[in-house]
Amino acid sequence: MKSASKQKIIQPVDKNLDQVYQVSTMVSLLDGIYDGDFYMSEAKEHGDFGIGTFNRLDGELIGFDGEFYRLRSDGKAYPVQGSDCSPFCSLAFFRPDIYHEIKQRMPLEAFEEEMKRIMPSENLFYAIRMDGTFKKVKTRTVELQEKPYVPMVDAVKSQPIFDFNDITGTIVGFWTPQYANGIAVSGFHLHFIDEDRNVGGHVFDYEIEECTVQISQKLNMNLRLPNTQDFFQADFNKHDLAAGIEAAEGNPE
């Protein structure tokens, strides 16, 4: 009589917990494709955490703990509605793998070097959350655009800039490897909201007073492209990608 063979039971990996769900591409925003087909009613199927923008560039998206907000060009935060639509966003289920405490004042440049030191590899994707007090946070939010849309490098020229000093709140966003630049924004891409959920925006400078950092490593990216004629007919080969993203997302000073 043959003995029954023992088979190792392999538990399936839940890919949703190990991925960045990427809606459209950064290069499409550079091209002025500001109307998408991703409704925020779908967002929680793909993440409880994320950043992005809204149709017509009408505000910045920030989300964590399953709560999503629209940060408009008046600098104020508004709860997201399911009927709101996004042409570009990055979502993830946030399950921290790394915890790190910052107990001293630290400017942006020093913090980014500290993060690169503790991240296992710069070739992976990471969702990043920073909760704490900031000596300063400088943000911007592009104003709502009207058709015919101009390229993003022109749209940001009139963006309102806000300086928040000695403020407590949360910065969230993603680290994207250089090889994925153009799909998302390579390096750190971060948005801010204060602890009262009243104000915030796209972050381009900050100085930490003290904060708790949580990092969620992601090994996969799920790219969802728009099913729109604007996207189908766009010519993405005409851009100086690195220069365009720096002009659109970097420090305007």
Swiss-Prot record:
Keywords: Acetoin biosynthesis, Decarboxylase, Lyase. InterPro entries: Acetolactate_a_deCO2ase. Pathway: Polyol metabolism; (R,R)-butane-2,3-diol biosynthesis; (R,R)-butane-2,3-diol from pyruvate: step 2/3. Coiled coil: none annotated. It comes from the Bacteria. It is an enzyme of class 4 (lyase). GO terms for molecular function: acetolactate decarboxylase activity. Pfam families: AAL_decarboxy. GO terms for biological process: acetoin biosynthetic process. Its EC number is 4.1.1.5. It catalyses: (2S)-2-acetolactate + H(+) = (R)-acetoin + CO2. Belongs to the alpha-acetolactate decarboxylase family. PANTHER family: ALPHA-ACETOLACTATE DECARBOXYLASE. Converts acetolactate into acetoin. This is Alpha-acetolactate decarboxylase. It comes from Bacillus licheniformis (strain ATCC 14580 / DSM 13 / JCM 2505 / CCUG 7422 / NBRC 12200 / NCIMB 9375 / NCTC 10341 / NRRL NRS-1264 / Gibson 46).
